[in-house]
């Protein structure tokens, strides 16, 4: 082994480490160290010299150390020897240095030298002379037994090395050495050991000498001068055969000596040879202990050497020894002969006759071992052509005789050792059969030995089991001869001399070969060999058969090629060949002789064998072909009177007479009649029952009549049927059932079976006659008999074949005319079904059997009975041309097919499978849909038998309708149903469904589905799943073509839903089915479901959701609903149907159905529906016809159409938000409350519009386009909805950019003049929002818009309109100039002022904001006017600074800041700035400061404030009343005397006095303060109060 550099370094390091450990005195680990070193050294190519030297040193030292354990010393020696491969000279030097003359060496040094001599022969030979000389001086010193043994080992190995050199010196790399000098030394050593040590040697030492003996003598034989002495020592060696432990080594040494003698061509002395023969034979045949196997093999090889050198003398020795009766010696010699023959020793061939004679000597030996040995020797002799033509036949005959000996030897068994003898005889038989199988008949000389004497073994029954190889031998011989004849000019025909052997007659050969051919149908090679032999033996059988068999036999052999065929068919073919052959021969004497030969073979076969049954039929057929009527008559009489010669008398006589009747019906019937008249049947019957006499009974004769009818010529049968056959059978049956008018043995099974068999065969015969005009008058009577038999059978057991046979009889009788009525058929079938299917399970039936054979019989009866019932049902059903009648008969099985007992289901399905086979053609109108639905799901039933039968039946349904399926694929799938894995079953059933579903007639789908739905309700879980899979598969395949049946299908499904809801998995299949139908007929399904009453029940909701679950069809479903809703809302009126659509949409959308593509249409329709159902009650009560289960005290809720519609719209918006089409409403969930209320609907719509995702402007534009019509709708509610929606959208610039809102603007303007306040409000809002969405449109349409909006200011009855108008004006005015507004300015100002005191905060606030916005629009024209209007409005602004609504206070502050400049009162800004502080000033303080400033600037305005204040004293707001009083107080305080005098003191005092009684304390205090101020000011001016 070559190592890499790295590995070498690592290895050397390892060795160095190991050497370091060897240097220690640690003995314990040295054994492992040396074992490791041995492995390393032997697996390493190169070792460092220094390492080698160190290893040699340590190994040699430890090897010689007596203190070391022997095992360690031995391992050290192995290491030392292994090192010789790296440095031989150093190792040899080390060993030789410790191997010195006249010094007794260490034992292991000698062993090391010996091992070096054998392991390194080439290197050792040069040192051998010195070693031997030294060793010679040491032998005298050896006294220890172990040391002597060591020297013997050394002598053995030195001799082997020198022997190798002597015979192969040319292969050695140095010049030839003088081998004689070496052998001289070996001789001296050997002489010393044999003379000095051997006589007194212990057993152990003797063993060592024996081992050295062979190699040493073998070496010495090459020297003539030593040869005598060497051979003289062989007897000593032979004398050592004493113990099994040493015998092998003696034989081994002997073999080495014999091999050397052959090599050197040395002839051993005769006495020595004989001694060797005897000793070796004893080793092979030693008794009582068997020889050691290895020793026996060595001894055998010694004999082979002797057979090569002295074959003649060896054969003489064998001949002498084999004559003794010693079994072991005979077996040993036969075994040695077999080995010698098998070795194919050329010199042994000269002694073939001697070998044959030796074999013949022991042929009479009855010992099993001897016979087996003889057979094996004959086998080898045949293989090696050691058979001599003249003397060889007895050996072949011996082989056959030993095969047949088994039966003869066991006929009289020895009771004590019977089983042992049987085994031994069987071994002989097997050996002889093996010899025959391996016999090559074409080996030189064998054809002359075998032919034609080999034919003598064909006919005797004892050679039956050997016929297969026998036929092969005969066929090879004949075919080889034919080949020679074709290739050679001169005939080399086989020798036909038979000597004393008697050959079989042609009739015997034909009879035997025909009978033996029968098992060929079962695949037996013996049968095929027989028919093959017939093919090549026509000339031997009869010359006339050559041409016939030349054509017929190849046809006969064809069905056998590669497969088995029906036994019945094969039997028929053979009988037909026999018929044709006999007619061809046409020789009465020849036929009569064949009859006798058939009879002679009766005892050769058992009654139940196929051969025996065929033999009876062949005998009957031969009689039928015999033209001698007298002979036929006599034979029939003989069989009737002495039937026991046939074996089974009933079967035999029945078969013979039946087949004989084919050509001799008159003779058979006449002889039968005569026989009946002559025999006393009653007594005869009793004798057969009680005395055991084997004679025919009446029941036997009944059976015979049936067979005769079955085989009778059809043209003759019907004319003689009633009187000569049926009447006789009925008469015999009646006689057996009654004696002296009394019923006896009415339960006799044999009687019933015989009667049934006879009737069955008669029925078959009549049917085969094919006479359409024949009316079988006994039909109903005989069927009645059969039914009675069946009724009498127990329902809890199956012990008799009566049911089975009676069913068969009924089947054949039912086919005959006159035809039975449908009711008769149904009664017959129902009766039989009820007597078979309810039987207990098969295992329970079998448990009644006491033995395994009984159990097998019960199972056989069970299988046959079920098969017969299936065939009966099949016959009665399909013989009927009326499809409805067939269906009626099939319905008889329906209850059993769904039975809760699986064994009943199993039987029903197995029967169904027999009925639905591919060889049937159903009536034209036969419906398979319902049956398919019934059968198919059970392909996943609990039992594999049910699954297989269900699948077979399912496939069969299509075949009977003439529909051809993928046979191979279906068969493969069907086989897979054997699996117990439920998932595998479901998968296979699904595949079958996919294959066959497309072939179901369209008009039968409804029936199929009805059956499947029933199955979903009632079957087990696995079958239920199969139901669902089949239903879905069929709907997938054929759903498109179901339009005409759709409503019925849907109705059927709905009908089953309440029950199936309790079964979750089944219900899921229902939903899947609806979805599948909808995928083809969405509109129809939608319309159908919409007809469900409102509110939808749970099932209806579930159906809608199920339809929505399918991504592929959900969009289609939504579109269908949209179309339906669109149709329902065409006239802007919402009917109940529209509400149903909305509810359906809710269920669909709630399943997460994508609305992206349909959202605009959905949204507008649902919004329209909400609008149209505002305030609407349900017009009709579609739920009234449906009963609701309600709790006690619960009231039935009447659905609100608007709320239902709103709920759907809410669901839509939620989905739209998920898809990014809308956003959350600013109203939250309150939106939907607003939307569904008539009073707040427009608010909800606006909020909904604001939730539109502006970024999805494409979607909104689609919505706008569809919603545009709402503005001109005849429905006021819908117009409001549209106006409200558009009012919000009009503030979106992007929509003005991409959409056509101009038309909307025009329509909005028109709506602003509508009489409906809400509509006007929404229109005005839309106009106002235009300012945000399209400012340019405002300027363009300012006149139109302003007029419409200003008009809204006059709608005083509805503040919502006013407020909306104010807001709209504010937005629009922000975009206009004074010139744009000039024409409308005054009107706007005046109308705006009217709303400063409005009760609605929003109106007040908007009016104030608007007034502020009007300031910049006064222009020159309206500046003075506006200033005057400010004066009038100033008090409102001042008072409302403390409005309850803080926003209004801020607005008043802002408007004051804007309006002050118009009055030239800029000085007031400082006072107004105080209003900007975080904490507002007190009203009193503010007003006084304001009035102080105002009084200084403009007393007129101060007076105006006073004159307008009285109206506010009665304000509904406390804070305004208080502020008004405080302002009055400030005004009075700051009026000049002139204006004080103008005060209406009385009125003012009265009002203030009244306010002192105000509920508000603040007002009271302000009024009191104001009165005091008034009083003080009046005093100041001397004005009395």
Swiss-Prot record:
HEAT repeats lie at residues 28-65, 228-263, 272-309, 310-346, 405-445, 531-569, 572-611, 662-699, 777-819, 964-1001, 1021-1059, 1112-1151, 1157-1195, 1258-1295, 1363-1402. It is found in: Cytoplasm; Cytoplasmic vesicle, Secretory vesicle, Acrosome; Cell projection, Cilium, Flagellum. One of its GO terms (biological process) is protein kinase A signaling. InterPro entries: ARM-like, ARM-type_fold, HEAT_Maestro, HEAT_MROH2B-like, Maestro-like_HEAT, Maestro_heat-like_prot, MROH2B-like_N_HEAT. Keywords: Cell projection, Cilium, Cytoplasm, Cytoplasmic vesicle, Differentiation, Flagellum, Repeat, Spermatogenesis. It comes from the Eukaryota. Its main location: cytoplasm. Signal peptide: none annotated. Constitutively phosphorylated on serine and threonine residues in acrosomal region of the sperm head, midpiece and flagellar regions of noncapacitated spermatozoa. Phosphorylation on tyrosine residues increases upon sperm capacitation within the acrosomal and tail regions in a protein kinase A (PKA)-dependent signaling pathway. Disulfide bonds: none annotated. Found in a complex at least composed of MROH2B, PRKACA isoform 2 and TCP11. Interacts with PRKACA. Interacts with TCP11. May play a role in the process of sperm capacitation. This is Maestro heat-like repeat-containing protein family member 2B.
